[in-house]
Amino acid sequence: AMTMGDRIMLLNDGSIQQIGKPIDLYNNPKNPFVATFIGSPPMNIGDAVLSKDTKEIIIGNRVKLEIPEKDNHLLAHDSLIVGIRPENIKAATTDTNLTEKIYVEVENVEVLGNETVFSFKLNEHIWNVKWSGQWRINIGSTIPIVINFESLCIFNSETKQLIKAPTDIEKHIIDDKEVVM
């Protein structure tokens, strides 16, 4: 779908879900259907609850991320749906703060030449990670990853509509104009 046109319309059961440039649907999907339709592997989706006391979003009872003050409006909800693109889940390093590391057990791994895709289970959901390059990762290994709040798409769990788009997307576009080097 990303290469089929300048603008696309995504339908689900005959109902228009979103119209726009493919990259806009990819970066700012209006709902989880659009999020999981566009992209390979698709966006990871999971249920989340909010802790109003600690001002954290808790994904799958395991991943706890602090909510920045500018996003405190999210605390008005009890539960949300979160999404993150596989390429936005990062590898933890020795410099990564211990509280930011999330240890996951590898369920499957594919080294595809210029990238490595592996999966892990977060509650009942299988999530995918896509890293550039060739990584020596074995099925059954436990590895540390990092999920940043800024990388999340957050959807209202009742309306399924996007209420927070990712804010850390790398964009290499200059005013929709051709770049001459």
Please provide the spans of the model-predicted regions.
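A cytosolic small-molecule/anion-sensing beta-strand core signal
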Residues: 4, 12, 84
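Hydrophobic Walker B segment
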Residues: 2-5, 37
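Non-catalytic connector elements of ABC transporters
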Residues: 43-45, 52-181
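Short boundary/loop segments of OB/S1/cold-shock single-stranded nucleic-acid-binding domains
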Residues: 22-39, 86-98
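ABC ATPase "signature
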Residues: 11, 16-21, 28
